[in-house]
Amino acid sequence: MSKRLSPQLQHNITEDAYCETHLEPTRLFCDVDQITLCSKCFQSQEHKHHMVCGIQEAAENYRKLFQEILNTSREKLEAAKSILTDEQERMAMIQEEEQNFKKMIESEYSMRLRLLNEECEQNLQRQQECISDLNLRETLLNQAIKLATELEEMFQEMLQRLGRVGRENMEKLKESEARASEQVRSLLKLIVELEKKCGEGTLALLKNAKYSLERSKSLLLEHLEPAHITDLSLCHIRGLSSMFRVLQRHLTLDPETAHPCLALSEDLRTMRLRHGQQDGAGNPERLDFSAMVLAAESFTSGRHYWEVDVEKATRWQVGIYHGSADAKGSTARASGEKVLLTGSVMGTEWTLWVFPPLKRLFLEKKLDTVGVFLDCEHGQISFYNVTEMSLIYNFSHCAFQGALRPVFSLCIPNGDTSPDSLTILQHGPSCDATVSP
């Protein structure tokens, strides 16, 4: 044991403390028992096999350790603050996303109900010659009512699932926010203690040094990571309207608007990058989707649907271009003039983006065929995963100006030649009565 003789002599270790047993200066420190020793204590059997060093050396060693933990604590505090801010931002973001997906589901339901009603009317018109057969007419009406009811039930279920996933996500984020907030408070308190410890004199610093060190380390071992939440885009809207078959358009590519890097097939349905025409300048990590071409067909009214095979492309875009096209290879490239779905692969990871605004979507597996639906009157554009028969994303209440033209684009690679290609698919006869020349 050690004892203080005079408060005025606390900073002079040779006069600061004396051994109560031997009344000699305590100039040594036992790291095992965490006490100061005099020379006679050091020679005793009790400390014979313990790690003992000079008291100044011990203090400096602990001071360095405390300083290292202090630096680590400051770094960990910044990381915890960042996670806390991110979780708070994500809480606001998922609320907005939930509302957006709710509007998207409601918009898709309204569109499908309109198409269903139109299909019902067409079926009744085709049975006009059998109008006297009331049983047949009643059967058609009952069938339409049943389909409309099933459609409403499906979309109500989707809204309920969306709400359930949204609540689960919010609970996870709130729990994560609470953990991050608690860690920020703990680290702030620890940093204050460590700063005080590093500034203390030799004896004060060594007091309970090992305990303070271990407690500090245990706080730093607490791992913090952001909450894992369910992507709302997983709430797929299943099924494709049977009316899409009627609205299917047989599109062709317009050579006059094709980028010089593109080679078009003879039937003007397939586009691929020319060999040896890639622009190698610039950042090799940059994605340049300027290898663009418009469809020869344009739309000013009505509803239209087409499908694109993207299986042989690793970086592609499909969508709608609204505006005028200039000379060959110089179609307007302002992003604000296009509504796009973008697909890209990095290694084994596939990513989908929609624009505008730029938003990333969750993709469970590679997309092979994209369906595009356009309703000019209602300002709606929908993208579909044809293979999975599900909605990818839709835009509603778009303010279109002028003629609308389907747009297709491939990414110009920097370096090696890309084998990427896109093909416009055709299924059966087309109904192009509402297609403008």
Curated annotation (Swiss-Prot):
One of its GO terms (molecular function) is identical protein binding. One of its GO terms (cellular component) is cytoplasm. A zinc finger (B box-type) spans 14-55. Residues 55-200 form a coiled coil. GO terms for biological process: innate immune response; protein ubiquitination; response to retinoic acid. Its EC number is 2.3.2.27. Signal peptide: none annotated. Residues 231-429 form the B30.2/SPRY domain. Zn(2+) binds at C19, H22, C41, H47. It catalyses: S-ubiquitinyl-[E2 ubiquitin-conjugating enzyme]-L-cysteine + [acceptor protein]-L-lysine = [E2 ubiquitin-conjugating enzyme]-L-cysteine + N(6)-ubiquitinyl-[acceptor protein]-L-lysine. Keywords: Coiled coil, Metal-binding, Transferase, Ubl conjugation pathway, Zinc, Zinc-finger. Pathway: Protein modification; protein ubiquitination. It is an enzyme of class 2 (transferase). PANTHER family: E3 UBIQUITIN-PROTEIN LIGASE TRIM (PTHR24103). This is Probable E3 ubiquitin-protein ligase TRIML2. It comes from Homo sapiens.
